[in-house]
UniProtKB/Swiss-Prot annotation:
Keywords: Cytoplasm. Residues 63-80 have a biased composition (Basic and acidic residues). The keyword Cytoplasm applies. Gene3D superfamilies: Helix hairpin bin. GO terms for cellular component: cytoplasm. InterPro entries: DUF896. This is UPF0291 protein EF_1580.
Amino acid sequence: MLSKEKIARINELANKAKVEELSAKEKVEQQELRKEYLEAFRGGMRHHIEGMKVVDQEGTDVTPEKLKKIQREKGLHNRK
């Protein structure tokens, strides 16, 4: 997760860009912060999805095999 300060800085640069042009240094900073934000977001989303177990209405595990394989590798949901 990104720190509150970094998220605030992302928003600050975005708002400034709407009003005036960012300097070259600010544009580079904005790109780096956005990249870091996306990496954190994608990592969190991947972690969330990898922890899911999908079941149908009868309670049968219908988790996709690709996800089951990842869960086995990570030792999640007692997959063997």
